[in-house]
Curated annotation (Swiss-Prot):
Signal peptide: 1-24
Protein name: Early nodulin-12B
Protein origin, superkingdom: Eukaryota
GTP-binding as UniProt keyword: no
Function noted in UniProt: Involved in the infection process during the plant-rhizobium interaction.
Keywords associated with the record: Cell wall, Nodulation, Repeat, Secreted, Signal
Tissue distribution of the protein: Root nodules, stem and flower.
Biological process terms in GO annotation: nodulation
Organism: Pisum sativum
Intracellular or extracellular location(s): Secreted, Cell wall
Region (7 X 5 AA approximate tandem repeats of P-P-X-X-X): 34-68
Residues covered by region (Disordered): 30-59
Coiled coil: none
């Protein structure tokens, strides 16, 4: 009785291991794949046609010049004479 159970267990485990590997590619359709190593085609580089860019004109509205902040001079750190909170 034990040998029948042991042999059926071994047969069942062997079927679990072997059957999925045997039927793995069975239901798949064959796939046409392009060749991996295609020959290289030497084409000359394509030259881009030059694009005409019209000269830039100044805008019609007036914009006053921006004054530089005193923070720019002192590397964005106030000194003691500029600090009004001391």
């Amino acid at each position: 009785m034990a040998s029948l159970f042991l042999s059926s267990l071994v047969l069942f485990l062997a079927a679990l291991i072997l059957v999925p590997q045997g039927f793995a590619q069975y239901h798949l359709n064959p796939v046409d794949e392009p060749p991996v190593n295609e020959p290289t085609v030497n084409k000359p580089p394509q030259k881009e046609t030059p694009v005409y860019k019209p000269p830039q004109k100044k805008s019609p509205w007036y914009m006053p010049e921006q004054k530089e902040s005193h923070l720019h001079v002192y590397d964005k750190h106030l000194t003691a004479e500029h600090n009004i909170h001391i």
